[in-house]
From Swiss-Prot:
Signal peptide: none annotated. The UvrABC repair system catalyzes the recognition and processing of DNA lesions. UvrC both incises the 5' and 3' sides of the lesion. The N-terminal half is responsible for the 3' incision and the C-terminal half is responsible for the 5' incision. It is found in: Cytoplasm. Belongs to the UvrC family. The gene is uvrC. SMART domains: GIYc (SM00465), HhH1 (SM00278). It comes from Microcystis aeruginosa (strain NIES-843 / IAM M-2473). Keywords: Cytoplasm, DNA damage, DNA excision, DNA repair, Excision nuclease, SOS response. InterPro entries: DisA/LigA_HHH, GIY-YIG_endonuc, GIY-YIG_endonuc_sf, GIY-YIG_UvrC_Cho, Hlx-hairpin-Hlx_DNA-bd_motif, RuvA_2-like, UVR_dom, UVR_dom_sf. PANTHER family: UVRABC SYSTEM PROTEIN C, UVRC/OXIDOREDUCTASE. This is UvrABC system protein C. GO terms for molecular function: DNA binding; excinuclease ABC activity. SUPFAM superfamilies: C-terminal UvrC-binding domain of UvrB, GIY-YIG endonuclease, RuvA domain 2-like. GO terms for cellular component: cytoplasm; excinuclease repair complex. Interacts with UvrB in an incision complex.
Length: 625
């Protein structure tokens, strides 16, 4: 059932809230929580919809800060009724995958644990390590996150030595393959010396390794090697033999060997305190530990069973059925374990058991997982203590009324005024929060080639960042992204420019601002002619330096990106009828000017917005008669 989207939130209109709750049935199903813009904040499931949704708005119900923030934004509730709990779980999983709501991530986005990504969306997919899961293309596959980064890098290194794979994001040469092809590390995808089908077949074998199916892959390769030998194709047989040896070496390097190698199983456990919750999931295949995944969750969100239930739902939502093990070992019963087991069975195509182990070998495995979860918790607490110490020290140095929960850092990057850009980075509780980072293109016409003006650029950025607070000061109290401290990369001049703008906007009292100069690591405060006397090794100063360095890095990388885009577009600007929008479409499709130059008329016409006549203009520009 779907309702109308209204501007007032439900907690501001209790009559409408109560009427809305009465409309929701006491049946299994899926519910949607929307904000005033109609965006889905959260998708959930329940065997009793009304009871579950009402719990969010019950005054006596304790909510974590994250969930409380979500509830304050809810303006509408929608729901879909299902026949069974299993149906609601399957529907919830599909809807979350489709809409990716902001508050549906129980697991925190911790960048220290990397993933393996295979870009199946590309004609010749790449495989690489990344610390961020992107949802731009549903065809791409992510495996992980992996706790042991060194082992992961070694594994990928060994795989690339065993199987010929694409090595570069872009070709090194446009008319010939690079050295990787000559030494057998790459099949020459840049020159299309292998068909996409054959290349994908190779990559499917690699994917089996990260799915925990190395034993199955070894059996397949052994069969192929025997067939090649019988057909007198000894070169192919030798290639497969080398691949088998590489995989066997990889298998030997696994650190833990376990009995009962006939069953694939995952074992999960957590360790938590009032502030932190660390989850470890060990993947055991053919009696060997092939993967160790780590997750962080909101420790205030639920009890142990509820957290584990949600973690498993989120984890197995992102994996293929063939990757789901036959058995999952748990430290406790799950609140909806039967529903989860039914959903996993449907996805895998065979029975999946959720077990609280009684046998000694399984209990020992689970104890090892719990021990690792506790170790990660202690490590996280030590890191949090260091961050807290830095914040406390910084508050003392700058005489702040409270700890700076949100710190923002700003920097300008340009080359003699050309392509001037700015960065805005954010640190939450002393930790970089790159999901809140922002780029700014400087629009001031006085900032141009040959005339750089960092002061004017910073003034423009600060004016744009705080405009909505100057227009309506009430926004400050209602905002969840107003900074406790603003750090400017620069000296007294840069700080004075920012202070002047904040004064014009009547925000000088509300915005605490400092600057940090690079040369001597000097900290300047508004109204002070001399820098603060500090020790560069103080925790608070080191935190400011991290913010400053991150703002600088982010600004420089964006400036470099803008220069590259401008240099590519400069040639395209000369083509009649090719505007900015179609230039973007061309570059998005072909990725480089060289590929556009080499494209045929038919290939050019495949680009969105490029008709026959414009394709001829582009082709003739690069191929003059």
């Amino acid at each position: 059932m779907f309702g109308n989207n209204l501007n007032s939130t439900l907690i501001q209109d209790l009559d409408r809230l109560e009427n809305r709750l009465r409309e929701i049935p006491l049946e299994p199903g899926v519910y949607f929580l929307r904000d005033q813009n109609g965006e889905i904040l959260y998708i959930g499931k329940s065997k009793k919809l009304r009871s579950r949704v009402r719990s969010y708005f019950r005054p006596s119900q304790p909510l974590s800060p994250r969930i409380a923030l979500m509830v304050r934004q809810v303006t509408e509730i929608e729901f879909i009724v299902t026949d069974t709990e299993a149906e609601s779980l399957a529907l919830e999983a599909n809807l979350i995958k489709q809409h990716q709501p902001h508050f549906n991530t129980l697991l925190k986005d911790d960048k220290k644990y990397p993933y393996i990504c295979i870009t199946w969306s590309e004609t010749y997919p790449r495989i690489f390590i990344t610390r961020k899961r992107r949802i731009n293309n549903q065809k791409d596959r992510y495996y992980g996150p992996y706790v042991d980064t060194r082992l992961l890098r070694y594994t990928l290194h060994l795989i690339k030595r065993t199987f010929p794979l694409r090595q570069r994001p872009q070709p090194l040469f446009k008319d010939r393959p690079c050295l990787n092809y000559d030494i057998g590390r790459c099949p020459g995808v840049c020159q299309k010396l292998i068909s996409p089908q054959d290349y994908r077949e190779t990559l499917q074998k690699v994917a089996m390794i990260f799915q925990g199916r190395t034993g199955e892959l070894l059996e397949k390769l052994a069969t192929k090697m025997l067939a090649a030998s019988e057909n007198l194709d000894f070169e192919q047989a030798a290639t497969i033999r080398d691949q088998i040896r590489g995989l066997q070496a990889l298998n030997t390097d696994q650190k833990v060997s376990l009995p009962d190698d006939t069953v694939s199983r995952d074992a999960i456990a957590l360790a938590k305190d009032e502030q932190h919750c660390c989850i470890q999931l060990f993947q055991v295949r053919s009696g060997r530990l092939v993967g160790r995944l780590g997750f962080f969750a909101d420790s205030q969100s639920a009890n142990e069973g509820e957290i584990l239930q949600k973690v498993l739902e989120e984890h197995y939502l992102s994996v293929e059925g063939v990757e789901i093990p036959s058995e999952i070992l748990l430290p406790c019963e799950l609140p909806e374990g039967e529903v989860l087991a039914g959903w996993l069975r449907e996805k895998k195509g065979r029975k999946v058991e959720l077990t609280v182990p009684q046998r000694q070998s399984k209990a020992d495995l689970l104890a090892m997982v719990e021990k690792n979860a506790l170790y990660e918790l202690e490590k996280t607490k030590r890191s949090a203590d260091r961050d807290l110490q830095s914040l406390q020290d910084l508050a003392v140095i700058l005489d702040l009324p409270a700890l700076p929960h949100r710190i923002e850092g700003y920097d300008i990057s340009h080359i003699q005024g050309s392509n001037a850009v700015a960065s805005g980075v954010v640190f939450i509780d002393g930790v970089a929060a790159n999901q809140h980072y922002r780029h700014y293109k400087i629009k001031n016409p006085e900032v141009k080639i040959g005339h750089s003006d960092d002061f004017a650029s910073l003034a423009e950025v600060i004016r744009r960042r705080f405009r909505r607070y100057a227009e309506n000061p009430d926004n400050i109290a209602e905002s969840d992204d107003f900074p406790d401290l603003v750090m400017i990369d620069g000296g007294k001049g840069q700080l004075s420019a920012v202070v002047a703008v904040l004064g014009e906007m009547n925000l000088l009292e509300q915005v605490k601002v400092v600057s940090l100069a690079k040369q001597r690591e000097e900290i300047f405060l508004p109204g002070e002619s001399s820098p603060l006397e500090t020790d560069k090794e103080q925790p608070g100063v080191q935190l400011l330096r991290r913010v400053r360095d991150e703002a600088h890095r982010f600004a420089v990388s964006f400036h470099r990106q803008q220069r590259m885009q401008k240099s590519r577009r400069s040639r395209l600007d000369e083509i009649p009828g090719l505007g900015f929008k179609r230039q973007k479409e061309l570059l998005a499709h072909f990725h480089s000017l060289d590929y556009i130059r080499e494209a045929s008329l038919e290939q050019l016409q495949q680009v969105t917005g490029i008709g026959e006549q414009l394709a001829k203009e582009i082709y003739n520009y690069f191929h003059p008669r």
